[in-house]
């Protein structure tokens, strides 16, 4: 199969992480051709600086430099990564105005956070792209895919705008998938994600009229917040629809988060049985997506872990009421930047393979 022609709209935190995940998997210029990256600036020197120096993830494994597309331009507008040229394109208010067709881009990774509605994201298709992957929860009827859970539902003929869900849904859904697949069942559940701060938060107390607590300084506070991650699991695992809800606590760490799911099973079981089932899944049908640890680990130990969800058997609890055999707390870690970005790449590859197979039929 020819390299997948990809464009990244929005070269901020997640856009860059997705690009770095492509490089980390050894796909750049081989299986994936990143034709262009789009942002408000086209300053390739600044992009190269950001990619070379990452506070959390460190130095890249690839070479990166910036060059001019022609002597007439003021600043370098082309990234050269491992010898492969990537054009830096100026952002547009309307995705339909981006030159995807002219550039030969087939798959757009929409990572601005602005075009998460299906109708708005379809602007990329009007601009010449064939498919769009939104690196966030989407609205307006876009198909939501969580790799390892429901990717088989992707239809080349009908799914042109696809959401990769959220990083938290990508952590929670694999755990819930195993619990339901292995017949533990979920009668009801409450999820809390202890989530590292993100770029949308404030470094010092600032204005946030829609979310007063969200306007407080991120690096010195534990901030309660909302999340739709638990409810979104019902979109990819229909048997849990309406059974899960949750909230978030934003905490003063720059990366890595952890999901705490307290649930009631539909049958009697034990911690040992749950541990065994999840460990087996992590080694077999969920390998590479779900991990298992029985070590005494902390959040920093999961930086750059590309698995969506790493179950912590040391933190699993069972209600200690006499005779209670259905009430449990399970805990799973995730690098909310790195693992999620790898799943975006996996989803693009999966879609491209299915699309190619469909076109031959």
Swiss-Prot record:
Intracellular or extracellular location(s): Glycosome
Binding site for NAD(+): 13-14, 39, 92, 135, 336
Cross-referenced PROSITE patterns: GAPDH (PS00071)
UniProt name for this protein: Glyceraldehyde-3-phosphate dehydrogenase, glycosomal
Domain of life where this protein originates: Eukaryota
Marked site: Activates thiol group during catalysis: 195
Any one Pfam family match given in the protein's UniProt record, by short name: Gp_dh_N
Species of origin: Leishmania mexicana
Gene Ontology molecular function terms on file: glyceraldehyde-3-phosphate dehydrogenase (NAD+) (phosphorylating) activity; NAD binding; NADP binding
Record-linked PANTHER family: GLYCERALDEHYDE 3-PHOSPHATE DEHYDROGENASE, GLYCERALDEHYDE-3-PHOSPHATE DEHYDROGENASE-RELATED
